[in-house]
Amino acid sequence: MANNNLWTDSYWLLLMQACKKKPDDVKSPWSKTMVDLAIELHIHPKTLFEKMEQLLDHKTASLQKIWDTYADNPRRLNKDAKRVREMKGFGDADSFFMGVESIDSFETFYLPVADDTKLTPASLTILIDLYFMLTPNTMVEETPEVADVARMLTLTTKEVVEVLAIFQTFDPILKRKALPTSALVEAARKVWDEYANDTQNMNDKKERALAYYHK
């Protein structure tokens, strides 16, 4: 869990901004809105979720003032939130990562596995779940489930099929020839090793990933 000492009161404006995104409500801690802000601030989504609940309750005088000032004034909110983001040192990863490993693992779940791809451990988690739902002869671009997942992850059907083909090389039943080593192959191997014999873990992580990619 994130250290609360990374939190500053100026971040209330960024939370208010996230809160006012449609629909106006407490976002799931794993929604794209919350995760992207958590990565930006280097604060765990669950911590931000707790803060957002406090903001919505606005039971303290300071939070009530923020609510009165910005809740119905989106122009001022966006202007002042932009100023917060422009502050010197905002989102400074170097100062954040010193001695903090647990948040690194949360962030990397949503970050690309290589510079030349937008695939992430989160999207690979959804794709390995798809893999176990299909048979090899249905792991093709024409399969509706392939198209649906591609659309959700903003990938091409070709990219989805390529990842499914990588997973096939790890499947001991299929005995496919190994592919040349690459960052994507290694990331897919890591996902396979984590989930292939741990369905509960895969389902838990899949739900988290789906919350992020849900439109």
Where are these regions (language model features)?
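Intrinsically disordered, charged low-complexity linkers and terminal tails
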Residues: 1-215
